[in-house]
Amino acid sequence: DRNGNLYKVVSERQSEAAKRALNRKKDRRHFSFANMRNIREVIAKLSTTDCGRLLVLIGHIDFKSGILVNERGNAMTKKQIQKTVGLSERAFRDFFRKMTEMDVIQETADGKYRINPDYHFVGSTDSVEVVKAFSSAVRKLSGRLRPAELGFVYKLLPHVHYDTTMICADPFETDPCKIRFYNVKGIAELVGMDEDAARRVLNKLRKAGVLAETR
């Protein structure tokens, strides 16, 4: 903020401890990986709002098959994808065409839909150049934040330090002394927003439990 405070993504361990008392029945370990290098290509081509709609869909990636699924675990139809991202038929047609032309959304041989695994994938990996997106957490955020605010979150994903979860310019740096952390001004420039607007979104994300402010 104006005092130079920094921001970090709240770790899954921290967030789960707080959420466990709310609902013990749901499996909150279902997640997909975001390839931190590759999604920069997506971010460069999509508006912040469309990045937010993509994040909404990430919350519906089946943790076994990688297919987009509805609340019942069945493969999503195109109509269900439209409803999930909250667009009119005409607006969705433009959105879906853009996403398929960019090869972000793919149709499988059996007519199902998935997010291109070059960007978001399931399974296991030894790479440190990934960040986990927990399905339950993403779905919860989708109900609390507007698409543009979700897009703000998505644009931060390539900048989450793999060890500290701080928002920084060099997320794969192993020497703590060399990590260049972002303050609110740096984050504003990163997401293409003026500083006051970025501060308002950061405050909302902090209250939603997505980010923590550090000094």
Where are the language model's segments positioned?
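Short recognition helix of helix-turn-helix/winged-helix DNA-binding domains
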Residues: 1-71, 117-178
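Winged helix-turn-helix DNA-binding recognition segment
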Residues: 63-113, 166-215
